[in-house]
Structure formats: C-alpha cells, structure tokens
C-alpha cells in the first residue's frame, strides 16, 4: 500500500507517518518544505520510502509520476492563525488543495485532508453545517473555502465522490512532535517549557465573559487524531466532513493543572488543587492580549454526531490523561 503524506515533517503529518509505521506500512512518500530544517527531527526516527519537496510534488503527482497511490493524507498547509498574508494563505491552503483533489479523483486515489475548527470561528455551535461556519481569520476562511468547494463538487455529504474524500476539522490538537511550531504550538507545550524555566505556567486572564483560565476548548490528543485518520483509511466507503475533537470542552485551567501536577509528581511532589496552584504562584494569569480581541475563540466543543454516525466509535482521552502522557514524553525526549 503506497501512501502519500503531505506536511509529513509537521506535527500531525509526522504522527501519521508514525501511525502508519506502527502498522507495518513504510511505503510512504513524505512531502514537505524543509526550508526550516529543524523539522527533519520529526522524521528521523521513522521509515519512509521517499521524500519530495512540496514545490515539486503537486505537478509530479498530477502527472502520475508515483504510480498507483492508495491514499493521500493531506496535512500540508500554512497553519499560523496569525498570518495576515491572505495570498500566501490561499495559495497554500486552497489552490494547491484543489489541484491535489482533482488529481486524486482522476487517479482513483483517496484523499483524507486537514480542515479545521477555525472554520467555525465566532460560532457557538460546532456542527458540520454551513450556518455555523463563521471564520475569524484568513486561515479559517482558507480551510472553509476548500470545504465549500468539496461540497459543490461532491454534494453536501460528498456522496458524489468517485473515490473517498474525507475532511477532518481538527480542534485543539496537542502532543509529541509539535516543537517546531513556535508560537502556534499547543498551550501544553508552552506551559511545559514555562514550568521547566520558571517553576510556573501562564494563562490568559478573564476575557469574553470567562473568568481567568476559564476559556474552554476541545483539546484533543494527537494519538486520537491519528487513530481516527487511520479508521477512515480502513473504511474507504466513508466520505464527508467530520469534526475531530473529543466532544468535550475543558477549561485552560485543566490543561495548566495537568501540566503542573504531572511535572510535580515527577519530582515526587504531591498533586495540587487549582486553588492551591494559583495561591502558590504556580499558575500565573496574564492580561489578555489586545491583538487577539475579536479574533479569539473562547469556547469550542466538537459535535461528534457525524463521526459517530459514520461508525467511528473511538474513545478520546480527556485532558488529564492526554496531557499527562505528553508531559512524560516531553520530559524524556531530546528536542
């Protein structure tokens, strides 16, 4: 089984390569842009058949240069929600995705692609339906526009797809192999580094009607994201747009406390309550950044009805379980 993974040296892409390797699949064409070379570390311990630069891949794939490819996991994109260059964003996230889609349909190759919960933006309902899609930035719009294009070409539920097309609206993903993402890495990653350096972690103060640290997101562990992607690989008859979160919103305070307690326990210190951690200065609330006002999702929670109706019954880790596993990985990793 030959598989292509775009964005293969990135966070989700490299974890997908690992997940495929764990199944004994190594006939993998890894596609990425290693201009920022540090990302190579995400692939160094994995097995792939070939590496192709992203600038060369799309035309070569359209020409059939790689023979029969079973599926493309399309994770390659500009995922910086603070990026203001709309042309760059649309070229990378929309135009190239459209070209890849048409090539996949012509060659009978399945396409499993990364959409985003950013398509919902300011909505308070997170269900895969146009009336709830209100992106707050050009990143969210670039992802929404491709979803809309797929609906126009394939039908509302992708029922007219010649071969499988499945889009996954990732919520707040965290876990191993995200260290290259800088400011766009998860809050758990940043808090690990803060605690190691300063003995405390930082969270936004009150904003949007939420108390300090009380803003809520659907935080999903990377292992769960990989498991759902691979479930769809095993079920080629399933197409459509699907939320990929836990279906459970948890406050940022839960993440911070899981970070603090896991790292304290590694030092043989007792677990603390949120109140004690705040009182002891281990959780520090900072003023909400003016640059994010009006552009920030204070609440997200994936509606999993479509995913469950498709037959995927995967059980997702909660923040306490996933963050604890991630902290243990970070503490032992050489990154």
From Swiss-Prot:
Q: Where does NADP(+) bind?
A: 11-12, 32-33, 39, 75-79, 92, 143, 173, 181
Disulfide cysteine pairs (residue numbers): none
Keywords, A to Z, come to: Carbohydrate metabolism, Isomerase, NADP
Any coiled-coil regions, as ranges: none
Query: Could you give the subunit structure recorded for this chain?
Result: Homopentamer.
HAMAP family, per database record: Heptose_epimerase
What positions constitute the catalytic site? 139 (proton acceptor), 181 (proton acceptor)
Determine if Lipoprotein is one of this entry's keywords.
no
Residues bound to substrate are 172, 183, 190, 204-207, 217, 296
Q: Write out the catalysed reaction.
A: ADP-D-glycero-beta-D-manno-heptose = ADP-L-glycero-beta-D-manno-heptose
Gene Ontology terms, MF aspect: ADP-glyceromanno-heptose 6-epimerase activity; NADP binding
Enzyme class, first EC level, given as a word: isomerase
> What does the record note about the cofactor?
Binds 1 NADP(+) per subunit.
Natural source organism: Polaromonas sp. (strain JS666 / ATCC BAA-500)
> By what name is this protein known?
ADP-L-glycero-D-manno-heptose-6-epimerase
Q: So what EC number does this one have? A: 5.1.3.20
């Amino acid at each position: 089984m030959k598989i292509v993974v775009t964005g293969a040296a990135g966070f989700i892409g490299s974890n997908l390569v690992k997940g495929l390797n764990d199944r004994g699949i190594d006939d993998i064409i890894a596609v990425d842009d290693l201009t920022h070379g540090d990302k190579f570390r995400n692939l160094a311990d994995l097995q792939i058949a070939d590496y192709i630069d992203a600038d060369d891949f799309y035309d070569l794939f359209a020409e059939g240069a790689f023979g029969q490819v079973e599926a493309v996991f399309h994770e390659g994109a500009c995922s910086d929600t603070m990026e203001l260059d709309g042309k760059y964003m649309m070229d990378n996230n929309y135009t190239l995705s459209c070209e890849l889609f048409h090539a996949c349909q012509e060659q009978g190759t399945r396409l499993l692609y990364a959409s985003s919960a950013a398509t919902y933006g300011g909505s308070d309902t997170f269900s895969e339906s146009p009336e709830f899609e209100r992106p707050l930035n050009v990143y969210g719009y670039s992802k929404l526009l491709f979803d809309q294009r797929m609906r126009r070409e394939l039908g509302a539920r992708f029922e007219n797809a010649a071969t499988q097309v499945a889009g996954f609206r990732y919520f707040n993903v965290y876990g191993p192999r995200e260290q290259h993402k800088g400011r766009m890495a998860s809050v758990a990653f940043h808090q690990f580094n803060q605690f190691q350096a300063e003995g405390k972690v930082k969270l936004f103060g009150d904003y949007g009607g939420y108390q300090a640290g009380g803003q809520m997101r659907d935080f999903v562990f990377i292992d769960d994201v990989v498991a759902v992607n691979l479930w769809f690989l095993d079920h080629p008859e399933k197409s459509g747009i699907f939320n990929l979160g836990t279906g459970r919103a948890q406050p940022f305070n839960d993440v911070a406390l899981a970070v603090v307690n896991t790292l304290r326990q590694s030092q043989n210190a007792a677990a603390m309550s949120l109140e004690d951690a705040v009182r002891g200065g281990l959780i520090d609330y900072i003023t909400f950044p003016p640059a994010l006002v009006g552009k920030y999702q204070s609440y997200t929670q994936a509606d999993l009805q479509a995913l469950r109706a498709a037959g995927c019954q995967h059980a997702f880790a909660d923040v306490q379980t996933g963050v604890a596993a991630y902290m243990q990985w970070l503490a032992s990793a050489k990154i």
